[in-house]
């Protein structure tokens, strides 16, 4: 695979017999023993993902917090040091540049963790709007990351650190040692389960990976990462979010704070909110036989009303489900629509999201 980057754990994936695929400019493991098995391990036990391909961008300076707040839709001014927030970052027209996590060290230092495939675009966007007294540093190449996810994530990670992990609350982080390695550990994830995202220097990646492997943690690939986030109805950029899809249409209005100072896209998003949404992301459950896939058309009352953004067989729920962007007339829960699969309309019903909620 030409010109693809490799994470520091590439050799470990090969040793484990992973099937490697290109993803966002990287050569990444899509599966090891199988997507279904890896998915179920995370839902019922514990699994780990190499997510070293993610982008890390540091924002520092006296005005760092105000600048971050100008870049993003959510409000970081409400955070304490050691807090993480989920947010979108928009273009002036309200379309989405990316969704990301913002880590607050202090009012003068933030870390933004962005999607791998969007890192260069995000960095260019941030630099385009950069204020004079703010420094923007791309830390992606000097940062590796493992996501440890599942009901037993804390129990397992606690074996490798003296730090009491109960002190890291949901969407909080701490700088601690894991297996003797200095790490940033946050209680975050992309699976719908409890878990941690662990950041460290690339040369120490194999040490942490193998310590976790020795504790019986199942490695999981991008395939299971996708089916897990799908069941939890977490958006994937290029599917539920894009330059053409605003956070409001994606159902992320809770991450758009209109009551803060000006931010990029505020005017356009406010206008969209005040005019009322014309379309939005909904959940679909197939009634007829067939698996809905991204791009498939959705028909209601004999006319096209939207398209599937993500669809698959949901392994834990054992159902054919989809997320779809549909016109408001077809968005009410219980509405029956047709998904066009191989030229034929297959019946589906609009259902509530998320499909899967931990503990339910």
UniProtKB/Swiss-Prot annotation:
Principal EC category: transferase
Keywords: Aminotransferase, Transferase
Record keyword Transferase present: yes
A Gene Ontology molecular function term of the record: transaminase activity
EC number: 2.1.2.10
Record flagged with keyword Metal-binding: no
InterPro entries named among the record's database cross-references: GCS_T (IPR006223), GCS_T_bac (IPR022903), GCST_C (IPR013977), GCV_T_N (IPR006222), GcvT/YgfZ/DmdA (IPR028896), GcvT/YgfZ_C (IPR029043), TrmE/GcvT_dom1 (IPR027266)
GO biological process: glycine decarboxylation via glycine cleavage system
One annotated Gene Ontology cellular component of this protein: glycine cleavage complex
Known function: The glycine cleavage system catalyzes the degradation of glycine.
Catalytic activity of the protein: N(6)-[(R)-S(8)-aminomethyldihydrolipoyl]-L-lysyl-[protein] + (6S)-5,6,7,8-tetrahydrofolate = N(6)-[(R)-dihydrolipoyl]-L-lysyl-[protein] + (6R)-5,10-methylene-5,6,7,8-tetrahydrofolate + NH4(+)
Transmembrane segments: none
Family: Belongs to the GcvT family.
PANTHER family associated with the record: AMINOMETHYLTRANSFERASE, AMINOMETHYLTRANSFERASE, MITOCHONDRIAL
Pfam families to which the protein is assigned, alphabetical: GCV_T, GCV_T_C
Record-given protein name: Aminomethyltransferase
Subunit record text: The glycine cleavage system is composed of four proteins: P, T, L and H.
């Amino acid at each position: 695979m030409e010109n693809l980057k490799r994470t520091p754990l590439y050799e470990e994936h090969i040793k484990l017999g992973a099937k490697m695929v290109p993803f966002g400019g990287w050569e990444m493991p899509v599966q090891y023993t199988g997507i279904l098995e890896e998915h179920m391990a995370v839902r019922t036990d514990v699994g780990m993902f190499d997510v070293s391909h993610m982008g890390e961008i540091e924002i520092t300076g006296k005005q760092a917090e105000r600048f971050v707040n100008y870049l993003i839709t959510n409000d970081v001014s409400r955070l304490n040091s050691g807090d993480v927030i989920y947010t979108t970052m928009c273009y002036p027209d309200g379309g989405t540049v990316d969704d990301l996590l913002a880590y607050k060290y202090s009012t003068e230092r933030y870390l933004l963790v962005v999607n791998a495939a969007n890192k260069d675009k995000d960095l260019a966007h941030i630099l385009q709007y950069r204020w004079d007294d703010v420094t923007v540093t791309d830390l992606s190449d000097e940062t590796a990351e493992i996501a440890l996810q599942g009901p037993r994530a804390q129990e397992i990670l606690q074996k490798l650190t003296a730090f009491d992990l109960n002190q890291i609350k949901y969407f909080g982080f701490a700088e601690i040692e894991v297996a003797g390695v200095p790490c940033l550990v946050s209680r975050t994830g992309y699976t719908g389960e409890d878990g941690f995202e662990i950041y460290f220097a690339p040369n120490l990646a194999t040490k942490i990976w193998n310590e976790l492997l020795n504790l019986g943690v199942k490695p999981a690939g991008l395939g299971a990462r996708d089916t897990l986030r799908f069941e939890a109805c977490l958006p994937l950029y290029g599917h539920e979010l894009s330059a053409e899809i605003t956070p409001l249409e994606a159902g992320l209005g809770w991450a758009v704070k209109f009551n803060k100072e000006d931010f990029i896209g505020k005017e356009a998003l406010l206008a969209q909110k005040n005019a009322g949404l014309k379309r939005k992301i909904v959940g679909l459950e197939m009634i007829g036989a067939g698996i809905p896939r991204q791009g498939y058309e959705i028909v209601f009352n004999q006319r096209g009303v939207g398209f599937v953004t993500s669809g698959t067989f949901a392994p834990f729920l054992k159902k054919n489900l989809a997320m779809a962007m549909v016109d408001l007339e077809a968005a009410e829960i219980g509405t029956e629509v047709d998904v066009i699969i191989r030229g034929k309309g297959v019946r589906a019903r609009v259902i509530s999201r998320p499909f899967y909620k931990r503990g339910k």
